[in-house]
Amino acid sequence: KINLENLFSVTLRDAGEVALIDGACKKIVASSKTGHAVHISRMSASGRYLFVIGRDAKIDMIDLWMEKPAVVAEIKVGLEARSVETSKYKGFEDKYAVAGTYWPPQFVIMKGDSLEPLKIVATRGMTVDTQEYHPEPRVAAIVANHHKPEFVVNVKETGKVLMANCSFLNNLKVTEIAT
């Protein structure tokens, strides 16, 4: 049995895989084929799922509760990406996953247990400094708020941080913060 409290996710970049390493014995206990050049691995709030996203914008969802952890869902959310995150707020644990892409300039809100897309939000807009239109702002870091059902989305070239409140997804409230 895998000790999930002492498990590490390591990107095997050139192989296009993620290895799961037991922290006690330092051995690979499972590995999964993933997208190209995995950029980040994120654990779900429950600890059941590990989400990885490659620079090719492919997300793989690995179920760690299986006897041998394996990819149970995957989706390609764009052409280039860097970040994925899952909801952490009490009552919303594992409900949503959010991925941001460099191209097209957007973030995608998905079901956290299946990666089914629910909403796509474009990030094109004006820069905070010169108020010029930027057609290709890249979404960089995405972080889940532990105190509200929202995600903090960093939109690079615009100089904005977006606070996407997922309380009512059909009426998504996005607050812009100039940085």
Predicted segments with their positions:
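Predominantly soluble domains enriched in secretory-pathway, periplasmic, or organellar proteins
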Residues: 1-179
